[in-house]
């Protein structure tokens, strides 16, 4: 609720909020609003294991394989899809049942997330990264 209140001040800007913690799915609905892209490493607050999603989400921005439309820029949607696929593959490779289900919400079936780019120098996405004490990405503003 605190983050939702903080972000309510941004009424004309697009906001990307990435929560890669375990049980981060609980953030999804309170944070969702028009003009926001919310990415969580888990689908629900009940998925409480350590998450692999952040490693792959960050790696996506440095891997040409994540640039699915081959436009030279990796959107938040492309990074999300890349990371989700990598998590699934990692679980399968280890023979584990998939217990981590990343979620993306942007009130438009991924359309806004497909047009927001991070770390590319494009002026349509000047965002900052919030890193927690353990070096994990906890928010992109």
Residue ranges of each PLM-predicted region?
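Extended acidic, low-complexity intrinsically disordered regions
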Residues: 140-141
């Amino acid at each position: 609720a605190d983050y939702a209140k903080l972000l309510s001040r941004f009424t004309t800007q697009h906001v990307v909020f990435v929560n890669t913690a375990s049980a981060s799915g609980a953030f999804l609905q309170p944070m969702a609003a028009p003009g926001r892209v919310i990415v969580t490493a888990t689908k629900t607050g009940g998925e409480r294991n350590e998450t692999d999603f952040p490693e792959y989400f960050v790696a996506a921005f440095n891997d040409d394989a994540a640039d699915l439309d081959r436009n030279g820029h990796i959107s938040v949607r492309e990074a999300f899809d890349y990371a989700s696929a990598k998590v699934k593959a990692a679980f399968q490779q280890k023979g584990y049942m998939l217990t981590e289900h990343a979620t993306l919400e942007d009130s438009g079936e991924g359309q806004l997330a497909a047009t927001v780019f991070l770390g590319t120098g494009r002026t349509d996405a000047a965002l900052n990264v919030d890193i927690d004490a353990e070096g994990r990405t906890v928010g992109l503003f």
